[in-house]
Amino acid sequence: MSGHALAARTLLAAADELVGGPPVEASAAALAGDAAGAWRTAAVELARALVRAVAESHGVAAVLFAATAAAAAAVDRGDPP
């Protein structure tokens, strides 16, 4: 397993630990050695875990505030919607 795939699996495990869920297996991309796909999968899973954790501890309003701030930052950077 490549270093990138291992890092992606570690991020997935950290995301699960953060929200106390069951372990998530590495994505098919990670197992196939697709480092870019593994990183995207890990990033999405970590973002989902963070959203769940914030919603559980601070409520939905905090999630909406964070999403609005992230969207505003993307617009400032010129990222496409």
Curated annotation (Swiss-Prot):
GO biological process entries: positive regulation of growth
Keywords linked to the UniProt accession: Toxin-antitoxin system
Function: Antitoxin component of a type II toxin-antitoxin (TA) system. Upon expression in M.smegmatis neutralizes the effect of cognate toxin Rv2653c.
Protein name: Antitoxin Rv2654c
Organism of origin: Mycobacterium tuberculosis (strain ATCC 25618 / H37Rv)
